[in-house]
C-alpha cells in the first residue's frame, strides 16, 4: 500500500487558490475594521451557523474565507452580520453570551455547567464544593474551577504527586490511624502521616501549591462599570459577582442593568478577572442610589 502524504506546501497552495464563495461577496465590502462579533447565517433566521469575535472583524472574517477546511460552513452561509464593540473585552463577552443563547452549529457548545466545582481548603481538609450550592463569587479559600468532581480530585492528586503530599491526609485514600501510608514507603509522601513531617508543614505546602489556582472573591460590594474605549465608541460593561450584565453607552444607563446574578458564570470570571484587577481600566462602583465612584 502506498501512502500519500500531503505536504504543508500543498496545503498552503490549496488555501491560496481557494476562492471566496460568490454568494458572500456582497457582504465583504461592508465589513468593519473594528472590534466586535460576527455571525455567519444559514437558512435559519434564529440559529446562526457560526459566531466569532475579533479586534478586527474584517481581517478575521476574510481569514475564514481563505480556509479550505471551512468550505462546508461557507457553502451553507447565506449572509454575514456583525456587532461592533468598543474593544476586545466586549467582543469576548458578547461572543460567549451569543454562543450560549443561540448554540451555532459550527461552534463548540458553551452550556451552563451544573457540575462546576472547586476545591475548598478548610482548616483540616480539602473539600470539593459545587457552584450550585456555594456562591463562588464570595466564598473564601476556593481553588480551581473544574467541570466535575473527578477533574477536581485529579488536580488535587497531581499536586500531591508533585509536592509529595499525603493522599490519606488529603482524603484521596483511606488512612489507618498511627500508620504510614503506602506512598510513604515508596518515598512519594514526605511522611506527614507518620510524623516525618508536621501537619503544619504539610498544610503550608498544600496551600502554597494551591495558590496559583485561587478563585478570586468579588472585590466590590455590588456592581461596577468597566469603561472600554475605541475612537468611534465607548462602552461601560456592567458587572456584578463576575457576571457580565450587559453594556451601556453611559453611566446614567447603568442602573437599568443592575440585578442580582443567579449563579456563578465561569466564562465571565475567566474573561473579566484579569482586566478588572489589572488597574488598566477605569472602574466605577455603581451605587443603587446612583452615587458612582470611579477608581
UniProtKB/Swiss-Prot annotation:
One cellular component (GO) term of this entry: excinuclease repair complex
Enzyme class: hydrolase
Residue span, GIY-YIG domain: 33-108
Keywords: DNA damage, DNA excision, DNA repair, Excision nuclease, Hydrolase, SOS response
Enzyme Commission number(s): 3.1.25.-
Keyword Transferase: no
MF (Gene Ontology): nuclease activity
Gene Ontology process terms (BP): nucleotide-excision repair; SOS response
InterPro entries reported for this sequence: GIY-YIG_endonuc, GIY-YIG_endonuc_sf, GIY-YIG_UvrC_Cho, UvrABC_protein_C
Family matches, as SUPFAM superfamilies: GIY-YIG endonuclease (SSF82771)
Functional description taken from the UniProt entry: Incises the DNA at the 3' side of a lesion during nucleotide excision repair. Incises the DNA farther away from the lesion than UvrC. Not able to incise the 5' site of a lesion. When a lesion remains because UvrC is not able to induce the 3' incision, Cho incises the DNA. Then UvrC makes the 5' incision. The combined action of Cho and UvrC broadens the substrate range of nucleotide excision repair.
PANTHER family, sorted: EXCINUCLEASE CHO, UVRC/OXIDOREDUCTASE
Protein name: Excinuclease cho
